[in-house]
């Protein structure tokens, strides 16, 4: 049964005010379905921004209440279609530098602090980067990103210069591929050099909420991540930023992260599901219920109606329910293989996407 909660600032959820205005009755669980429709219509017709309290109330729908969850999923899908249409965006990445990362992110196979047996190598050549970029472009990807391990590019001019050379080289030898970059904590000056090299989007996840982040990483702060996002936006880069579900956070933490992303005006939100890596502190984390993941995705669509919600690493954890994500808010995906885990083929993803009526 759904229960009333007090908001952070005191008082009751708007849900109860809505019910009082409607019939002056005490809230009953059966009315949740009507409230979902009420919120959906306000978002579509009034460009309404839902509150933290409303989002948390939606999160209380039990994971086994399929009737109510399907109403939530359908509402999220309608919001997606109104604000984003049927276009589905596909991006790809290459692990361009692997291992020996100085940071202690507890989920990561590439941290020097943990013994995971991951591959270790330096920055790849521009020729290999171009080969992978062209292969992905030919298979139908819209975007391609180099991803490098390490804290960031601050104070690493040699690596920055090499990356600039690689991005320019890819840009000169591809036609439609949009270039993205993921290189950790960066100054405006370093990011401007990436812009000048042809990079259009910078990826830098928040990973979790401000409250929970110290449980994930202590070698840099949540504000370090936010400042890098602000630096990227300041030099004209689009920003791709999201997080990982299954780190041990609560669903309220996921909602708080989404609200921070909304405040930062992020329009591409990667949604990862933890793949526990042996040797990391999170190797024994419990898996999140697939329907809780789908419920969270739907709530993200209510919070960020205009954004690309992007399936990324770990979506295989959803199993047969992964396709449902494309009917409850997802409208983009990282396709192909991920950094240190196996993904899906571009062709397989394209087939599924088209079967569900999207345009690529």
Swiss-Prot record:
Q: Write out the pathway annotation from the protein's UniProt entry.
A: Cofactor biosynthesis; biotin biosynthesis; biotin from 7,8-diaminononanoate: step 2/2
Domain Radical SAM core positions: 83-315
A GO molecular function for this record? 4 iron, 4 sulfur cluster binding
List the InterPro entries. Aldolase_TIM, BATS_dom, Biotin_synth/BioAB, Biotin_synthase, Elp3/MiaA/NifB-like_rSAM, rSAM
- PROSITE patterns to which the protein is assigned, alphabetical: RADICAL_SAM
**Which example biological process does GO assign this protein?**
biotin biosynthetic process
What keywords are annotated for this sequence in UniProt? 2Fe-2S, 4Fe-4S, Biotin biosynthesis, Iron, Iron-sulfur, Metal-binding, S-adenosyl-L-methionine, Transferase
**Which cofactors, by name?**
[4Fe-4S] cluster; [2Fe-2S] cluster
Query: What is the recorded function of this protein according to its Swiss-Prot or TrEMBL entry?
Result: Catalyzes the conversion of dethiobiotin (DTB) to biotin by the insertion of a sulfur atom into dethiobiotin via a radical-based mechanism.
Can you name this protein?
Answer: Biotin synthase
UniProt organism field? Fusobacterium nucleatum subsp. nucleatum (strain ATCC 25586 / DSM 15643 / BCRC 10681 / CIP 101130 / JCM 8532 / KCTC 2640 / LMG 13131 / VPI 4355)
Recall the taxonomic lineage recorded for the source organism: Bacteria, Fusobacteriati, Fusobacteriota, Fusobacteriia, Fusobacteriales
């Amino acid at each position: 049964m759904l229960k009333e909660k007090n908001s952070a600032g005191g008082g009751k959820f708007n849900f109860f005010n809505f019910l009082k205005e409607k019939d002056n009755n005490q809230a009953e669980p059966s009315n949740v379905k009507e409230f979902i429709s009420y919120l959906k219509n306000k978002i579509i017709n009034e460009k309404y921004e839902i509150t933290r309290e409303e989002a948390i109330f939606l999160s209380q729908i039990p994971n086994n209440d399929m009737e109510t969850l399907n109403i939530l999923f359908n509402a999220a899908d309608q919001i997606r279609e109104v604000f984003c249409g049927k276009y589905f965006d596909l991006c790809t990445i290459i692990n361009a530098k692997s291992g020996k990362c100085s940071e202690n992110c507890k989920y990561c196979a590439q941290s020097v602090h943990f013994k995971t047996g991951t591959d270790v190598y330096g920055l790849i050549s521009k020729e290999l980067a171009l080969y992978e970029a062209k292969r992905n472009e030919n298979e139908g990807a819209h975007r391609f990103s180099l991803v490098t391990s390490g804290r960031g590019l601050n104070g690493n001019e040699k690596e920055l210069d090499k990356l600039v050379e690689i991005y320019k080289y890819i840009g000169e030898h591809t036609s439609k591929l949009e270039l993205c970059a993921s290189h950790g904590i960066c100054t405006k000056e370093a990011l401007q050099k990436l812009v000048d090299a042809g990079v259009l989007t910078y990826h830098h996840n928040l990973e979790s909420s401000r409250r929970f982040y110290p449980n994930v990483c202590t070698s840099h702060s949540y504000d370090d991540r936010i400042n890098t996002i602000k630096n990227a936006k300041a030099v004209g880069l689009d920003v791709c930023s999201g997080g990982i579900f299954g780190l041990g956070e609560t669903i309220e933490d996921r909602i708080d992260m989404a609200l921070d992303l909304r405040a930062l005006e992020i329009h591409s939100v990667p949604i990862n599901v933890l793949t526990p890596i042996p040797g990391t502190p999170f190797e024994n984390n419990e898996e999140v219920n697939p329907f809780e993941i789908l419920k969270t995705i739907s709530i993200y669509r209510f919070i960020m109606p205009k954004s690309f919600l992007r399936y990324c690493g770990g979506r295989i954890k959803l199993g047969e329910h992964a396709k449902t994500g494309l009917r409850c808010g997802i409208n983009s995906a990282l396709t192909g293989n991920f950094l240190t885990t196996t993904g899906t083929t571009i062709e397989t993803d394209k087939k599924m996407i088209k079967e569900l009526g999207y345009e690529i």
